[in-house]
UniProtKB/Swiss-Prot annotation:
The keyword RNA-binding does not apply. Gene3D superfamilies: Ribonuclease Z/Hydroxyacylglutathione hydrolase-like (3.60.15.10). Keywords: Hydrolase. It comes from the Bacteria. Coiled coil: none annotated. SMART domains: Lactamase_B. GO terms for molecular function: hydrolase activity. Belongs to the UPF0173 family. This is UPF0173 metal-dependent hydrolase Amet_4625. It comes from Alkaliphilus metalliredigens (strain QYMF).
Length: 223
């Protein structure tokens, strides 16, 4: 499995025939993406906030990708002509590339539109399994005891928010790593805005139970 960090909480994930984006809030300043939007097969949306729903609609128009998200966001996107696969918290499903499980998150999920707020259902995260590897994207979340249940998934790589204020801060993200037991932890959702300023180096220093890889924007990690 190959991932490329696209900034904030956005990642490109490639494994076999799957070429996916997670929470595509993607800066226009990207210079070396390892993918073409036209080739994207799937888009995972953890919740409805604009910094996670991102450029989903424009990417789908270019790629005809299937969006995997919760039921309420699916209804909203389907009203815009988007092909969606609906899930909900705790559900696991088999896709053509492997399996997906939707996990709990402590956050909000309202979708902001010109007409007002649209219900975005429950926020979540995803465990994506493909070619014998498991990737966990936590979405935006506070620390929760439910994360201890993820240890049974034997996750290879966990993508965890560390920015605080809206999500876990460094201290709680360190606890989350211990709960989850992933082989590798990668920090995300920090330093995009002043209110979520955090030190990934401090996170790395404090984690004792897993490897930590700090990815620069556009950096690629293979596992």
């Amino acid at each position: 499995m190959k991932i490329q960090y696209l900034g904030h909480s956005a990642f490109y994930v490639e494994a076999g025939e799957m070429k996916a984006l997670i929470d595509p809030f993607i800066p226009e300043t990207l210079t070396h993406p390892i993918f073409s939007f036209a080739d994207i097969t799937h888009i995972f949306i953890t919740h409805g906030h604009g910094d996670h729903l991102g450029s989903t609609l424009s990417i789908v128009r270019e790629s005809n990708a299937t969006v995997i998200t919760n039921y309420e966001i699916s209804l909203y996107l389907q009203s815009k002509g988007v092909n969606c696969h609906s899930m909900h918290i705790g559900g696991r499903t088999t896709m053509d590339f492997g399996t997906v499980k939707m996990t709990p998150a402590l956050h909000g999920s309202a979708i902001e539109t010109d007409e007002g707020l649209v219900c975005g259902g429950n926020p979540g995260g995803f465990v994506i399994e493909c070619q014998g590897k498991k990737l966990y994207h936590a979405g935006d979340t506070g620390l929760t005891m439910d994360m201890k249940l993820l240890a049974v998934e034997e996750i290879d790589v966990a993508l965890l928010p560390i920015g605080g204020n809206f999500t876990m801060d460094v201290q709680d993200a360190v606890r989350a790593v211990a709960f989850i037991g992933a082989k590798v932890a990668i920090p995300m959702h920090y330093n995009t805005f002043p209110v979520i300023t955090a030190s990934p180096e401090s996170f790395k220093e404090q984690v004792k139970t897993s490897q930590v890889h700090i990815l620069n924007v556009e950096e690629v990690y293979n596992f």
